[in-house]
């Protein structure tokens, strides 16, 4: 773990939250960091309201993975469409011309993050419930700068990054000690970077995979190969996403 002058250590943050004796909302992405947060919350016997946000609703490999975590933690996970889902629809991402007028007439909501937080609290918790995430300062230079500038506790928005000082080794150790297996994402995603084969890809907990995070070749190609029904589900919402595969295959000389 790291230390930054003047910033509250994550262990103290977690202990303070536990002392409040109130439920907390966990932004649960199924990624390593959010799993590590849940482990720490459970260790302190805290009541967790886990909320997952699906970039594309109804993907079976994600639903199956959420069920696995529900069984492990013995807690229901709320699964909502992500704000990115509505944003992509409103921006007509991968939409054929005949759908554009229909989508524009539907006027789907495009809530900001703070509005989304308010909706989560209104429906599943109290107005002042803390929302927790697994943002870590060592994950990237940008995140380290954000932690140094704004701190891991945002009182105005009632958000906390409660493992901000953990390194990736700390995350892996926490998950390994509990015997938790990561979802298929960590085997599938990371094989491609910017449409090219990533020869340094390594799956599993000790690898460099990642959870599903967008509709682009790096994610679409593995879903196409490993979960064809889910790939068709993506095309149901974003029909022209298939052009992403065609485009990169042409660039890479596969067709």
Go through each PLM region and give its residues.
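Nucleotide-activated chemistry modules centered on ATP-dependent adenylation/adenylyltransferase
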Residues: 1-255
């Amino acid at each position: 773990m790291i230390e930054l002058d003047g910033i509250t250590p994550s262990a103290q943050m977690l202990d303070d939250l536990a002392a409040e004796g109130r439920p907390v909302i966990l932004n649960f992405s199924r990624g390593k960091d959010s799993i590590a947060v849940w482990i720490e919350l459970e260790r302190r016997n805290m009541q967790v309201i886990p909320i997952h946000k699906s970039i594309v609703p109804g993907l079976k490999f994600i639903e199956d993975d959420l069920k696995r975590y529900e069984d492990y933690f013995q807690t229901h996970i709320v699964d909502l469409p992500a704000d990115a889902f509505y944003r992509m629809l409103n921006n007509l991402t991968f939409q054929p011309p005949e759908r554009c007028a229909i989508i524009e007439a539907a006027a789907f909501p495009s809530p900001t993050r703070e509005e989304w937080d308010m909706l989560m609290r209104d429906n599943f918790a109290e107005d002042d419930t803390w929302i927790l995430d697994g943002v870590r300062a060592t994950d990237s230079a940008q995140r380290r700068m954000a932690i140094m500038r704004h701190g891991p506790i945002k009182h105005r928005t009632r958000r906390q990054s409660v493992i901000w000082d953990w390194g990736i080794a700390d995350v892996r150790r926490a998950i390994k000690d509990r015997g938790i297996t990561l979802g298929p994402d960590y085997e599938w995603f990371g094989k491609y970077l910017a449409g090219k084969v990533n020869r340094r890809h390594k799956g599993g907990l000790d690898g460099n995979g990642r959870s599903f995070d967008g509709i682009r070749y790096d994610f679409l190609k593995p879903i196409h190969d490993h979960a064809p029904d889910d790939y068709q589900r993506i095309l149901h919402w974003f029909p022209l996403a298939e052009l992403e595969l065609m485009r990169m295959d042409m660039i890479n000389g596969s067709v």
